[in-house]
Regions:
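Catalytic-site microenvironment of enzymes
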Residues: 1-252
Length: 252
């Protein structure tokens, strides 16, 4: 046997190489366990507080502006939703944003839901209640001059290519509207609620289930007072949150 020859040196070398290979290969597997490639993604919800800036929307007998009520509710709702969902607001302060940009934001963010928030306005102070709109090319109600809000329900005069986008989601939008109404009716702040289809411009180009919520009539003295109350807005927001949860539970 020649000097320096060790019969087990080759075996040891092979074992060490094998162990090294195993250790190297195991590293990506460990990383994969820590951060799964197919980790569940949060659903994206775009909340659209109506009006803003010079566009005040409707105003109540006590001078409450619709733009302020819609933003306050959107902020409260966003805070309630953000632990479960990715939430984006079309505006976060008192500034103007044109109506077409609102759905553009939702489309750009690839939102799973678009909810536009408004308050009703009427020259008839007794007008009351909550209305949930989904997009429909033919209005299910007569939009009369009683509507005093500065175009909260701006409609399109004729169908366009954009109409076809929201039409694809009409069934899902109706489901969302019904689930929201069910939850809203569980609270007794407002006496009535209804669901209507209308060719609303704010919903027309949304490429996802979308609704427009009119959360009571700000021109009704009693409802204006309710809409000034943070606890009332929090209850409304909670009802909307439950309706959204119900929707994703139903359509998943």
């Amino acid at each position: 046997m020649s000097a320096g020859y060790h019969p087990f040196s080759i075996t040891r070398y092979c074992l060490l190489m094998g162990l090294g290979f195993i250790l190297i290969c195991s590293q990506p597997l460990q990383a994969t366990r820590k951060e799964p490639i197919f980790a569940k993604q949060k659903k994206t919800i775009v909340l659209d507080p109506g009006h803003g800036g010079h566009d005040t929307g409707a105003s109540g007998p006590e001078g409450t502006f619709e733009k302020n009520v819609t933003l306050e509710l959107a902020r409260i709702l966003a805070a309630q939703l953000e632990n479960t969902y990715r939430v984006i607001l079309t505006r976060t302060d008192d500034y103007f944003i044109d109506i077409l940009s609102r759905t553009s934001i939702a489309n750009h963010e690839k939102a799973d839901l678009f909810i536009s928030i408004h308050a009703g306005g009427s020259f008839l102070h007794q007008a009351s209640g909550i209305t949930i709109y989904f997009f429909n090319e033919i209005s299910e109600s007569v939009l009369t001059p009683d509507t005093a809000s500065s175009k909260p329900l701006e409609t399109i005069d004729h169908p366009s290519d954009w109409s076809n986008i929201q039409n694809r989601h009409q069934t899902s939008s109706k489901i969302l509207a019904n689930l929201l109404q069910k939850r809203i009716n569980e609270q007794t702040i407002f006496e009535k609620s209804e669901i209507l289809g209308a060719p609303l411009l704010v919903l027309e180009g949304a490429d996802m289930p979308a609704v427009c919520l009119e959360i009571g009539y700000i021109t009704n003295p009693a409802e204006e007072k309710s809409l000034q109350d943070i606890s009332v807005l929090s209850n409304i927001a909670q009802s909307i949150q439950h309706g959204i949860d119900d929707f994703f539970e139903k359509v998943r």
